[in-house]
Each structure stands twice: as C-alpha cells, then as structure tokens.
C-alpha cells in the first residue's frame, strides 16, 4: 500500500471514529479532504453524530466524485421529501451508482419529494443501466403514486431482475391492468418473477 493510500485509510478511519464518538467538529473537518472516500465517510460520521446539515448534503450532491454524491443521496433517505436536498435532478446523474442511490433514497423519503415520481418513471423506462431501472421501479412501488403505474407496468416486460422488482412494485396498485400484468407474471419464464407474482397475488 502506498504512502498516500495509507494516509487516506488513516484519515477515513479517523472520520469514522469521530462519528462514533459524536465528535461533530472532527468529523466535519474531513468534508474538505482531498480523498473522496474520506469525504464520503465524513458525511456518514456526521449523520451518526446527528450533526449532518442539509447544506452538507446539498454541497456533497455537487461533489466531483460519484462516491461522495452517492453517499449523500443515500443519507438523504432519512429526510422528508418536501425539504432539501432535492433528489430529482440527481436521478439524471452521469454515474449509475449515484442514480441507483438517489432512486433508492427517493423511495424511502416520506412524504415523497414533489415531482420525483416523474423522474423515477423516466429512469425506470429509459435508463441504460438495469440496476438503475430496478432501483427506480422499486421506488415507484414504495411511493405508490398512481402516476407512476404506467412505468411500473412497462417494467414488467424488462429483463428478469427488473421484472421481478416491477411485479413486487405492483403491490400498492389495483385495476385491470395490474391484474393482467400479474397474470402474465405468474407464467414468466423466470422463477423469481413467478414467485414475486404469487406473493403479490396472495
């Protein structure tokens, strides 16, 4: 391990320890660290110390490193969707790991962020990365907004992992289109999709 890498590991450990000790000042000092993994750890440490400010997340979502942006998106899951930070624009991030984290967090926030259903639907039906599509359709199911149903239904014809998530995401919805999608899923060639359909249909 090179000297610089060793130093970064040491700083990352120090940031994590600061969070466990509730030392917000020490944790905050690592937000400006040159190493992205240290900055990301500092965000988590501040959250653990209950000192993570909205401004910290907003700044981190604009960080040049995807590692930091993804961590900030994850931590935003703990905040109501009607306050900053806004995750809708983050769902258009160039890095798939950030989009995945923002999609997951969007499904966790209560109340949901205004306008996020449309952004999640766009990811569900149009993102190149299937992991992002999977995370987005799961979030649509968690939110349960009827305007997201068309995207969920479209995802039931995607690749197996996305189909399975889409079928599970149908749980809060009802109507003939939902019933038809579940019926199709019961005879899907993938056993996990069939199992998901059975679980939702019970």
Regions found by a protein language model. Give the residues of each.
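Structural detector for internal amphipathic alpha-helices that build alpha-solenoid repeat scaffolds
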Residues: 2-21, 29, 37-51, 56-59, ...
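TPR/TPR-like (Sel1-like) alpha-helical repeat modules
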Residues: 186-191
